[in-house]
Amino acid sequence: MNLSAPPARRPIFALGLLATALAASFSANAQTSSVRGGVTSLEEIRVLPSAKEAVKQAPGVSTITAKDIEKRPPANDLSELIRTMPGVNLTGNSPSGSYGNSRQIDLRGMGPENTLILIDGKPVSSRDSIRMGRDGERNTRGDSNWVPVNAIERIEVLRGPAASRYGSGAAGGVVNIITKAPTDTFSGSVTAYGLIPEDSNYGSTRRTGFNLSGPIADKLSFRVYGNIAKTDADKPALNSQASGMEVNETTVPPAGREGVRNKDINGLVRLDINRDHRLELEGSFSRQGNIYAGERLFSRSTSTIASLAEEGAETNIMYRRAGSLSHYGDYGQGRTSRLTFAYEGTTNSRLNEGLAGSVEGSISNPGAGSVSELRSLNISGEYNTPLQIADKHVLMTVGFEHRDQSLDDDYATRSGQSINNNTDSKSKARTTAAFVEGNIELTEALTVTPGVRFDHHSKFGDNWSPSLNASYFITDNITLKGGIARAFKAPNLYQSNPNYLYQTRGNGCPYDPVTGQRVSGPCYIFGNDNLSPERSINKEIGLAYDNAGWAAGLTYFQNDYSNKIVADMGDQTIPDAVYIGGSLVRPFQWVNSGKAVIRGLEGNLTIPILGENGDTLSLSNNLTYMITNKSKETNQPLTVIPRYTLNSTLDWRVNDRLSMLATATLYGKQKPRSHNLSNNSEVKGDGLRERGSYAIFGLSGAYQVTKSTNIRLGVNNLFDKRLYREDSGSGQGANTYNEPGRQYYATLTASF
């Protein structure tokens, strides 16, 4: 049933937003008056952190600083570093293993589609321009590679209840990439990075980036950064031995990691109107082009695939254009505001990948391509004001967000067939939201942060996302923290478009669970505009200790996940054949599935060994342990992730100029699915093979050559532990990706 609000309700919702804004304005005025209605004058109020800042102290929040990035520079994609945080894995969006080397950021096992990527608080959605296949996967690198390493101030990773204020797509969590701000004095830096693998079958990386900022005139300053990078593709023969497939004119083994060429430029101008108000105007352009390595959805190879892989052809190009205008206000005594208008446009140009049968996800014609266009408009704002209610200190936040998103993908609807005889290639969605949250100091030891967000979606109606986080100081050094929140994700523009179609003549049709026989084709799988949003109740509770360089913590988390959107391939029902476009076919659709549960533990331990608070030598560890991650309906995993992940870092500052870093990451066993949801069949043989536990070690050192010049040399995968991909289809089990062998890297930064 379509839950969109009737026209009569829309003015009511608009009035609700207006009332919220007026309430914020009233509270701002009331704070300068005398005691009235339980609200005392602002002069008596002690300003607390905002709710947004308070939840960053929750157990499920981690921060990667610019210094951390310098110590462990990623080769190209930020996901390489973000994966070292607790609760973070790199995986696909389903247990299928499709496009296994294009892994994305997965927070607490909820899948990449439930990880919201932000740049300076603004949503990034370029991956949404890429077609979603029936197994729930996209052939994409994700959205973690639009900002060059040298431009980052810090990265905030919010997992669980702390992320609920961000709305749709943040059920797993949020990754917020914060860039460097303009400086008061003219300054800049240039960074060059190179990575060379010991085995030439693996791709190498070169990148150069710059960062420049300073004043233009009185009250006017700027910041600009740019980046050029290239990571070569793995050789087509890399997985030959593991898969038993040789490279020839018509055959290529399961693909290794594809390469990528990056070009990024970003500029920001800041106008300080006065001491309390400023405007920021920002614009950016990025180009990402792949270097093809032979990737396809199934194991079938063709002469076209083999030729493109051998050539290292550029088979898809992503162009991203973004711009924003923001106002920041400080009205004194803790009252602040922000208003942002942001635009993002993505052009996805690629060689056509099959939409039918065994050629689904495979390139068959190197001369045939298509373009999809995704445009997003985001308007958001918030107002923070301190209050004192019933003798309690409160920092109240009210805010709103409006998102408009439109997608035009002619190729995905090119079959000319649809359930409703409408083959429009365009789809749109609009979301309007308001939220209110407060940081309340109930006692000197107990702080609670309640909040609620209301979203109205143009297709799927209303959604409420209440949340409650709390922090209690048992002692000055021991804190008990917890939270609970309701999160959601609206169907994406492919899942909800009834004109989006995958078709198969018969071999891709599902098996009937009653007869055990494959359903006779052809079969069509359509988008569905009658879906419900995915929902999750996220809970966590943790204990933390922090004293004189020692830090320890243990957190239990649980996500009760429901309504996950999947392509119904006979698991729920086998539809009767109907006539569509003059042909008798079986119409399947995207549907909401049943309940799932994710439970796990996150822990951390930092040990100061030498120096004050360990500033000379320290050992830092974090652990993620997955207790369960499965559908209650099918008993299948939601994603293929390690049972546990342990990250350890030994950080030694030898002297003022020299420092050393040793790292170790241990991954637990990974189990594959036992049931193939894409055709409703049981997985057998090699498809049930697990990936055993393994460990990766690294070593690096940095030397401050001069005050403005720094060099770092390092070795990744010190003991040369290599993992291979055994198949491109369901026969690979959990062996869905490559772990590259030993690599040597160097990075040089010159600043002024």
How does the language model describe each region?
Residues 304-327, 427-429, 479, 483-561, ...:
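Outer-membrane beta-barrel signature, preferentially recognizing the C-terminal barrel domain
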Residues 31-71, 120, 330:
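Short, acidic, small-residue-rich periplasmic hinge/interaction motif at the N-terminus
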Residues 123-159:
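Short acidic/polar hinge/loop motifs at secondary-structure boundaries
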Residues 201-293, 319-324, 390:
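Transmembrane beta-barrel wall of Gram-negative outer-membrane proteins
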Residues 35, 191, 441-443, 552-561, ...:
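Gram-negative outer-membrane beta-barrel transporters
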